[in-house]
Structures are given as structure tokens and as C-alpha cells.
Amino acid sequence: MAQTSSSSSSTFEHLWSSLEPDSTYFDLPQPSQGTSEASGSEESNMDVFHLQGMAQFNLLSSAMDQMGSRAAPASPYTPEHAASAPTHSPYAQPSSTFDTMSPAPVIPSNTDYPGPHHFEVTFQQSSTAKSATWTYSPLLKKLYCQIAKTCPIQIKVSTPPPPGTAIRAMPVYKKAEHVTDIVKRCPNHELGRDFNEGQSAPASHLIRVEGNNLAQYVDDPVTGRQSVVVPYEPPQVGTEFTTILYNFMCNSSCVGGMNRRPILVIITLETRDGQVLGRRSFEGRICACPGRDRKADEDHYREQQALNESTTKNGAASKRAFKQSPPAIPALGTNVKKRRHGDEDMFYMHVRGRENFEILMKVKESLELMELVPQPLVDSYRQQQQQQLLQRPSHLQPPSYGPVLSPMNKVHGGVNKLPSVNQLVGQPPPHSSAAGPNLGPMGSGMLNSHGHSMPANGEMNGGHSSQTMVSGSHCTPPPPYHADPSLVSFLTGLGCPNCIECFTSQGLQSIYHLQNLTIEDLGALKVPDQYRMTIWRGLQDLKQSHDCGQQLLRSSSNAATISIGGSGELQRQRVMEAVHFRVRHTITIPNRGGAGAVTGPDEWADFGFDLPDCKSRKQPIKEEFTETESH
């Protein structure tokens, strides 16, 4: 017993000496004390030391464990971590923003990133017809679709992604001023019953997946972005694409929703923990007529591209356009190179409409081709044009008396509105020593250079309007001229515009075609009864004015027998206009000889249509002619 006690005492002393002194514990008693007392105290002190040492070890162990867990967490690839750490589903909502990172940043990236698996998003060949429910424009990278219609999107990868990979579709606004806003449906579609009843997708989500029960609709707790996630499925045998059917549940023009703001659809290939393996994006437009909108956008894009290319190509020249003065007009005999000095200055003009653009392009090409023509040839062409302009008054009416008046306007216009013969001819009468003092404008205008009187033709009407008067005793047909549109003016002046179609349907285009019509003929033309008598009376008045003009023409030609020498020959077009003028008007003259007096033919030579005394004491010319003179 004593031997055992001594061995235990020596062991304790050896252990005690190996420990460092600590002020926490009291000193052991001296060995001079009794054996039994010392042994009892040593055992008691040893028991206290043992308990206090175990308590500090446990406290240190727990503290080390906590520090170790904070400083060096277990590796996620160790089997211990895989067995102990819980596996979070990519579709499960996080319980705290600190436990799980957000699946997307505040402003998602829309940059294409094929990634290690060469991630691609493609579309099937689509139609541009107006009846198409969706169509994709590779030129614009833009999807056009109708609301709630199926839009198949093809997913392709070169190598299989890791297990648990998912495909996320997220809408974001395209413009920088709207990119922080969340793309949601408008309140009208969100709260309505259409497309919402019996659907598992939240009503506020714009993008839905059709025909996939594994689709999860995610509302990010940090950014608030809405997206739809589906597990990646490898392509079936014989295909290289994985097709996902998407639906877009709100129009781009909806007020309170997208409100005509363009959006981008970002398709990402993600791992289980949210790592992006690939990214593709395209613009989306939800509208009523995808084919029409695609065609309009592509046409506008091509026009804008052509304008931008032209601006970029000639940008340096356009900067000098306002600094340099326009080139001077080239002198005669200069070569083409000198004439084109300054042509590098470019100017631009915006044109609305394809037709206007093509017209201006023709003008531009004509100007460029003109620069290639030698200057002497251009001068010769301009001289020919000026000569034609000098001769044009013989073919066209001078602007002093305006367009040709219709017969009814001339009949009802009165003498005070008639132009003079000088105005019709376009120049004053030619002077000649043989011309007498009483030869007025009318007489000089009716004479020819050979001294012969102008032949009178009583049938100078619309049907025989090709006849004219030239120098000599014969007549040659003048050049053709435009059809007389006086039929419309005639019927409109009578208050019968509704009857125009009755005549034009039968090929009657001129007023002269109606002169020989009777009231029975008007009935055969299906003219209404209330207009027949009015039209027939108007035709009778027109005939009377025509007969009076022919009588005046004969009298004037018989009285004016003085020859006009030199080059006083009238051109056929001028005479033709004067004939039309005299035939179509009722001319009144003053009563020269009093009542019942017989007037000689020579007394009519000094009268012209523009004399002021023609307005006084008007009397029809028919009453002034005797029977012998009229024949």
C-alpha cells in the first residue's frame, strides 16, 4: 500500500514539474507534513487541477472550432462537405440575401457570350406574311410576335453542359434611361381574366414557357427582376437543337407596361449555383401584325444604313462644305477637269418617301452625266434651246392673255372682257408704206403677204379645227393640238354638270360635237328631262354666235384688200387663234349710219375688237348687214 502511494506521488511530481507555473493555482503543501495528510491533500489538489484543466480545454476547443469555421471553411469539393452541407436547388427561393447570391446583377449584361460550350440561340425560318403570328429578323436581331402566341426558340451547344444546368429567359429594357425599370405586364393584362385563368405562372410575368411543367418563375429578391428558368434538356436523337416554346403576354404598346419602350430578351445558360456558361440576347416586339412591322423596320434600317455609309465615306468633305465658296462658273473652252473643280464638296438632304428618293436620284445621275459632256456641246445645246424658246410664242399663247377660254365663257363674257387682236397675235401689226391710215389691227391681222384676202370658211368648228389660213389661196392643216375641254365648261355654265357623263360615254368630248344635236338626240343620249331644254337652248345660242362670227369674218376679209409687203406673213398658229376668237364670240359695234342706214364695206375697216367705242349703243352685227353683203 505504501509502495503504491510512493509511486503515484513520484508520478504526480513529474507531471507537475512539466507544467508552467500559473497564478491561478495555489502552491502545494510542504512534504514535512504527515504522510496521510500529504497524501490526502495531493489527491484533492490533483482532482481540482484535473477538473479545471478539462474545462479550459473544452472552452479552447470550442473557440478553435468557431475560428476555424470562419477563417477556413470546408472545401465544397470534399466528401465531408458534400455530406454535411445542404444542396440548394437553383429554383428554390433564397431565405436571405446573405445566404444565396442574386441570380443576376442589378443591370444584367446583354453582351453575347458563347462560353465554353458555344451556346447559341437560333430561330426557325419564319414568314413575313401579315398572317404570321411570329417572325424573326436576322438583319435586326429582333423577334416580332403576337401576344400569347407560341414562339419556338432553338438552343444549341457544342458540348454537353454539366448536370443541373438550366436556361433562363429574362426581359430587360433596351435603352439606358429605362434599363433599371423592371419589365412587367400592364395592369390591364395582369388583372384581366384573359390568359390568366388556369395558369401556374404569376400574372405579372411577361415571359412564360409553354408545355414544360418544370418551368420555375423567379422574382429576384434583390433586383426584383423577373425571369423564367427551365432545366436544360439535351437534343433528341437526330436533332442538334433543343426547342423551348415561349409566350409573351403583353403588347409593347400597352400603357402602364412596356409603353412602347423597346426590350431585350436575354437567354442565359447557367449552372446550378448561378454561374453563367453562355449568353445570347435579341430584341423583342409584341405587336398585332409582326410581318408588317418587320418589313417596315427593315426598310427603314436599310435606308439609314445607306445614309450612314454615305456620311461616313464623305465625312471629311462635308466638314469643308461650309468653309469653301461655291466654284465659279466655268468659261467657254475650259476642259472637264477644270469645270469639276470643287465637286468634292458634298451636301446632304433628307428625303421622305421612296418615290421622292428615286426621283432625286435620277436628277443626281443626270447632273453627274452632264459633267462628262464637253462644254462646246453643252453650249450648242443651250443655243438650240434658246432658239426654240424664241419660236415658242408661235406655238403657244403668250402669257399676257392667259389660257384659251371656253366657248360658253366667251359667249357670256361680253365684249369688255375680250382681248385685242394685237394681244392674240402677240406683236403690233407690221408697218408698211402700202397700208392705208384706216387699216386697223383687225384689217392687218386678216391680210396676207400676197395681197389676197383670207378665205372664209363657214365650217370652222371643232370637227374641222384642223383647217387654218396661210399665205396664198390654199389651206394646209396645222399641227394637232390638245382636245378642247370646253364641253365640261359648257355644261357647267348651264347648270347641268350631272349630264357630262351622258355625252362623254358616247365619245362626245368637244362642244362642237353637240351643235347639230336635236332635242330628240338629247333624249337618246339619256339626258334627264329637266336638263334637255336647257342644253338645247344653250346649243341654239352657241349656233347664233357662231353664225355672227362667220359673217363678220367675211366682211372684214372683203374690206381689207391692201397688201402688206415684206415679211408680214402670218404664222398659222396665230391665225388659228384669231379665227377661234372671232368665230366663238358675238361681236357688237356702234350704229354708224343711224337707223335704217346702209353701211358700205369700207366703213368697217377701221374697227377693231379693242376700240373703246364698241361698248356704246350695242347692236348685233346681223342687223347691220344687207342681204347682198352677207352673201
Curated annotation (Swiss-Prot):
GO terms for biological process: cerebrospinal fluid secretion; digestive tract morphogenesis; DNA damage response; forebrain development; hippocampus development; inflammatory response; intrinsic apoptotic signaling pathway in response to DNA damage by p53 class mediator; kidney development. Residues 1-43 are annotated as: Transactivation. Pfam families: P53 (PF00870), P53_tetramer (PF07710). Residues 123-302 are annotated as: DNA-binding. Residues 337-372 are annotated as: Interaction with HIPK2. Disruption phenotype: Mice lacking Tp73 display a runting phenotype and high rates of mortality due to massive gastrointestinal hemorrhages or intracranial bleeding. The gastrointestinal tract suffers loss of enterocytes and excessive mucosecretions in the duodenum, ileum and cecum. Survivors exhibit hippocampal dysgenesis, hydrocephalus, chronic infections and inflammation, as well as abnormalities in pheromone sensory pathways. The keyword DNA-binding applies. Possesses an acidic transactivation domain, a central DNA binding domain and a C-terminal oligomerization domain that binds to the ABL1 tyrosine kinase SH3 domain. Found in a complex with p53/TP53 and CABLES1. The C-terminal oligomerization domain binds to the ABL1 tyrosine kinase SH3 domain. Interacts with HECW2, HIPK2, RANBP9 and WWOX. Interacts (via SAM domain) with FBXO45 (via B30.2/SPRY domain). Interacts with YAP1 (phosphorylated form). Interacts with HCK (via SH3 domain); this inhibits TP73 activity and degradation. Interacts (via SAM domain) with NQO1; this interaction is NADH-dependent, stabilizes TP73 in response to oxidative stress and protects it from ubiquitin-independent degradation by the 20S proteasome. This is Tumor protein p73. It comes from Mus musculus. The lineage of its organism: Eukaryota, Metazoa, Chordata, Craniata, Vertebrata. The gene is Tp73.
